[in-house]
Swiss-Prot record:
Keywords: Cell membrane, Ion transport, Membrane, Signal, Transmembrane, Transmembrane helix, Transport, Zinc, Zinc transport. Residues 81-91, 152-245, 295-303, 357-375 are cytoplasmic. Residues 203-218 have a biased composition (Basic residues). Belongs to the ZIP transporter (TC 2.A.5) family. The gene is ZIP4. Residues 203-230 are annotated as: Disordered. The keyword Signal applies. It holds the Pfam family Zip. This is Zinc transporter 4. Plants overexpressing ZIP4 show decreased zinc concentration in shoots and seeds, and increased concentration in roots. It is a multi-pass membrane protein. Residues 219-228 have a biased composition (Low complexity).
Length: 396
């Protein structure tokens, strides 16, 4: 009985407390929780602000580092023309080009194309390109490779036609020498070479006449075919110019994308490893592009313009990413689709250029095929370039 009397006041107090909680205003019950959330939000905002400032510092470092690395890479072959070992017809240049081709091939196959598949297969991007859907990334890469082949062929044909339609000198020293040989062999008539260029047959005929002067006649409306060593050299230079311009187009598209992606990132932990990886990436790609520019024999102005465009594209992309970082979301549907399509196109261009215009042209060169030591050195350089660029995929 006494125990019941002692417990009654406690029960009454507990009941009063429950009733007070029940009738208390909703704000009073959550005031402490709201205060805690405000403190948590303030701390999170402070951390986010510190991350943003650290990320901005790293982005500025990345702009300077990538700019310097790209410029150094593209200038190595260009300035290397002053050294006999690095001239376009030297053995060392074959190895440098093979290394650069391996870098470009790995860039397309290991870096860009998988990223394109991931972007187009992402659920945020609508699930295009992977899973049970259609592989749009592969389709775009294939279309870009075929378009590159068409541009390569059409542009080279146009430049050849425009070059060989130009007026040609009539009295060629080689023809004059051959004519002199005929005269020394017992020709009865003395004089100069009378040249008839037959476009339909694609060759020139030298006839010795008794006239005391030379004549040049051109028959037909089509240009003469490139049969002389000089014409073959011009055709090869035209091919190298087209290759270098199309290759730079593919590299520029890719450089803008990776620059914007890095510039829009807000986490220092994700930017820090990219600075070094992308610097090496731009350096190796610059070597490949610089080698093509050297072989194309561009004038100094065109060389400077192409080197400048390559060097500035990725840093400009980073600056653009910084400018739009507040509104840009790389995980949005639009961003993923655009990035996936452009990455696929860039991958198709670079894969085609590395295999067809760089590797196939050099590995079918008689100078390489008749030199076993040079062949082994070039293969080693190719595998080294592709391997080193593939290794960078761990960080970038």
């Amino acid at each position: 009985m006494d125990a019941m009397r002692q417990s009654t006041p406690r029960a009454m107090l507990l009941l009063c407390a429950v009733l007070m909680l029940a009738v208390a205003p909703p704000g009073a019950a959550t005031a402490a929780a709201v205060a805690g959330c405000e403190c948590g939000n303030a701390a999170a905002a402070a951390v986010a602000g510190e991350d943003a400032r650290g990320a901005l510092r790293l982005k500025l470092v990345a702009i300077a580092s990538i700019l310097a690395a790209g410029a150094a890479g593209v200038l190595v072959p260009v300035l290397g023309r002053s050294f006999a070992a690095l001239r376009p017809d030297g053995d060392v240049f074959f190895a440098v080009k093979a290394f650069a081709a391996g870098v470009i091939l790995a860039t397309g196959m290991v870096h860009i194309l998988p990223a394109a598949f991931d972007a187009l297969a992402s659920p945020c991007g609508g699930g295009r390109g992977g899973g049970g859907g259609f592989p749009f990334a592969g389709l775009v890469a294939m279309a870009a490779a075929m378009a590159t082949m068409m541009i390569d062929s059409v542009a080279a044909g146009y430049y050849r036609r425009s070059h060989f339609k130009k007026p040609r000198p009539v009295d060629d020293p080689a023809d004059a020498a051959r004519a002199a040989g005929v005269e020394e062999g017992g020709a009865e008539h003395a004089g100069h070479v009378h040249v008839h260029t037959h476009a339909t047959h694609g060759h020139a005929h030298g006839h010795v006449h008794s006239h005391g002067h030379g004549h040049g006649h051109s028959h037909g409306s089509a240009p003469a075919a490139a049969t002389s060593p000089e014409d073959a050299s011009v055709a090869e230079t035209i091919r190298h110019r087209v290759v270098s311009q199309v290759l730079e187009l593919g590299i520029l598209v890719h450089s803008v994308i990776i620059g914007v992606s890095l510039g829009a990132s807000l986490r220092p932990s994700s930017i820090r490893p990219l600075v070094g990886a992308l610097s090496f990436h731009q350096f190796f790609e610059g070597i490949g592009l610089g080698g093509c520019i050297v072989q194309a024999n561009f004038k100094a102005k065109a060389t400077v313009i192409m080197a400048t465009f390559f060097s500035l594209t990725a840093p400009v992309g980073i600056a653009l990413g910084i400018a739009i970082s507040s509104s840009y979301s790389k995980h949005s549907s639009t961003a993923l689709v655009v990035e996936g399509v452009f990455n696929s196109a860039a991958a198709g261009i670079l894969i085609y250029m590395s295999l067809v215009d760089l590797l196939a042209a050099d590995f079918n060169n008689p100078k390489l095929q008749t030199n076993t030591k040079l062949q082994l050195a070039v293969y080693l350089a190719l595998f080294l370039g592709a391997g080193m660029m593939s290794l960078l995929a761990i960080w970038a």
